[in-house]
């Protein structure tokens, strides 16, 4: 799919939910009195579904906890909240699992018996993030 000369990873419209587009409100809140402009966290989370076909990683069954705040597709879409910003203004990254699924990260395989591994700090990494998969 290409929109405004931007290719969305070569996917076709049929790969997306909701007939090729994602939608979310411009305002969010708990009541008509307590509303604010939508924050980027919810938008980024929903676009994770639409562009990358990623599942929700928060608890959808009410019997577990999902991945919590450890990824954008979990509760991390609400991210850090300072006293001056609304929830979702500073979402967290995609989890390593999500990054692997979309091809943004190739994990370093760690076999049983490996004594140590070194990962570069995120700010020192190349365009591809570093992660490990332990077997």
Regions found by a protein language model. Give the residues of each.
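Extracellular hydrolytic enzyme modules, especially secreted metalloproteases
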Residues: 1-135
